[in-house]
């Protein structure tokens, strides 16, 4: 299973994070499938490759809670229309 999660970069006391698509069994610093974004909590900057993120989500990738909050704040899910079916 693939997850969208944060990968820590930077130096001590000055962390920046890459948002990556990675296999769920890999370590936090393990080899990722693709880098799909960047997040700097100190400067509060975010860069997202939205087409790549939506592609991974459509293929079944699950974002972690923190990545979900970042994507929600950036309004990525407004572009991704969930197709819901009702069963009576």
From Swiss-Prot:
Pfam family, one: Ribosomal_S16
Principal subcellular localization: plastid
SUPFAM superfamilies: Ribosomal protein S16 (SSF54565)
A GO BP annotation: mitochondrial translation
Compartmental location: Plastid, Chloroplast
Family: Belongs to the bacterial ribosomal protein bS16 family.
PANTHER family from the UniProt entry: 30S RIBOSOMAL PROTEIN S16, SMALL RIBOSOMAL SUBUNIT PROTEIN BS16M
UniProt name for this protein: Small ribosomal subunit protein bS16c
Lineage: Eukaryota, Viridiplantae, Streptophyta, Embryophyta, Tracheophyta
Designated gene of the protein: rps16
């Amino acid at each position: 299973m693939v997850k969208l999660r944060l990968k820590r970069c930077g130096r001590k006391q000055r962390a920046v994070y890459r948002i990556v698509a990675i296999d769920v069994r890999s370590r936090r610093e393990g080899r990722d499938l693709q880098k799909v974004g960047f997040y700097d909590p100190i400067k509060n900057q975010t860069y997202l490759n939205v087409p790549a993120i939506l592609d991974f989500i459509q293929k079944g990738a699950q974002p972690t809670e923190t990545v979900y909050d970042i994507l929600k704040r950036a309004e990525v899910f407004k572009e991704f229309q969930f197709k819901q079916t009702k069963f009576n």
